[in-house]
A protein has these predicted regions:
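Catalytic-domain carbohydrate-binding cleft regions of carbohydrate-active enzymes
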Residues: 1-309, 315
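Accessory, solvent-exposed terminal regions and/or long lumenal/extracellular loops of proteins
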Residues: 309-391
Length: 391
């Protein structure tokens, strides 16, 4: 999908190609120097604005819009109301994006309570430094407490951050987000191949892993929709009775089965080795994704990771749906299912639901979707994995 960034507060001005048609639709003559003030409280204005500002781009394949920097400086509130502009515009843009049977979507800044209904939240023009990376990790997890489940950060930072190691570590955090998205003021250039061979290889491995994990990620997002659970979960959401769950903001659950604790400090040596302390919740077995090393839950471990890895753990005893790498992971159908299982404890019996639909339209609301239960059991030393018929 193509998404375009928009700063709409100036409306349609007299220097723009669509100005004459817009003015005529508004019942006014197109005269140089004459402009209509952007007015989100006027339905006629907004209908004409959406039509003439967006229609041409929509026909070229734009799926939805990134509403940027629309902070109440034309009017203090939406005219005729006491509502701030941002949540109202997020509502309008969300509904506009639903045309042609597409799902409503958008990127935007946080607009206050209730705003989670519409956009994927954009966290603003962040500075590129280690403290900001650390802050975004905690923000993403704790905002789920307010129903804000999906974030689209400027990975690497919008300003500054001319550090290849920092860039690679930020992308590792992006692996465990609803959106793995790059954006900056333009200097430095955030494209992964601009950061030297070591960082580029690290980032490439993250993008490839993101593709392989997409069946799990998409199924987990479906769970957000049906069960109202955040995608990035502070540890106390799943383990409210554990005191340690409240003491470790550096880590979070990504769906039911993955635990991440991204590196937020500079490493040492040529391999950029950095350490991170991780609390592993009790009553489960955990496996380091990169090394495969097994840990019993209910303890702290200190992970030393070079630039090509970070503390990423998988809960044992569950089937996790994956796929082979594909370079068009969101538009290609799932053709080859990979079910990865990390051994659980004796007697384990658990399931995971793989969810599939077309990824773009609202046809799933009419039942055009599939859920496939994956079962795992370990009994008397015998492991059994079952892929049940899709429903």
């Amino acid at each position: 999908s193509v998404v375009l960034n928009e700063h709409p507060h100036d409306g349609i001005r007299d220097h723009e190609d669509m100005y004459p048609a817009f003015m005529k639709e508004m019942g006014q003559e197109p005269v140089q120097g004459k402009n209509i003030v952007f007015d989100a409280g006027d339905k006629k204005y907004m209908d004409a604005f959406m039509k003439h500002a967006h229609e041409e781009s929509d026909k070229m394949g734009v799926a939805f819009w990134w509403l940027d920097w629309q902070q109440d400086y034309v009017y203090p509130v939406v005219r005729g109301t006491n509502m701030k502009h941002l949540p109202w515009l997020n509502h309008l843009y969300f509904n506009y994006s639903k045309q042609d049977n597409l799902r409503g979507a958008g990127f935007s800044r946080w607009g206050g309570w209730g705003d989670h209904r519409h956009p994927i939240q954009f966290s603003g023009d962040s500075g590129g430094n280690w403290n900001m990376l650390k802050f975004e990790i905690e923000l993403t997890a704790t905002s789920g407490n307010a129903g804000c489940f999906f974030w689209a950060h400027d990975l690497g930072g919008f300003y500054g951050g001319e550090d290849a190691e920092l860039m690679a570590r930020w992308i590792q955090f992006g692996l465990l987000n609803s959106s793995l998205r790059l954006h900056s003021v333009g200097n430095p250039d955030r494209r992964p191949w601009k950061w030297g061979e070591q960082a580029e290889n690290s980032m490439r491995s993250v993008y490839h892993l993101r593709s392989r994990l997409m069946p799990y990620i998409y199924s987990s997002v479906r769970q957000c929709h049906t069960d109202m659970l955040p995608l990035n979960r502070a540890m106390y959401i799943e383990y409210p009775g554990e005191e340690d769950a409240y003491k470790n903001p550096q880590e979070f659950l990504f769906g039911d089965l993955l635990l991440g604790a991204p590196i937020t400090t500079a490493g040492k040596g040529d391999a950029k080795v950095a350490e991170q302390r991780v609390w592993l919740p009790p009553h489960d077995v955990w496996y380091q994704f990169y090394s495969g090393k097994k840990y019993d839950g209910g303890q702290y471990v200190t992970e030393s990771c070079d630039i090509n890895s970070f503390p990423l753990f998988v809960k044992g005893g569950y089937p996790m749906p994956m796929q082979p790498y594909t370079d068009r992971m969101t538009s290609a159908d799932l053709k080859t299912l990979v079910v990865r299982c990390y051994p659980g404890s004796e007697g384990a019996s658990n399931s995971f639901s793989l969810y599939e639909d077309d990824g773009m339209t609202r046809d799933y609301e009419q039942g055009k979707c599939a859920s496939t239960r994956l079962d795992y059991s370990l009994k008397d030393g015998v492991t059994e994995i079952t892929v049940n018929p899709a429903e």
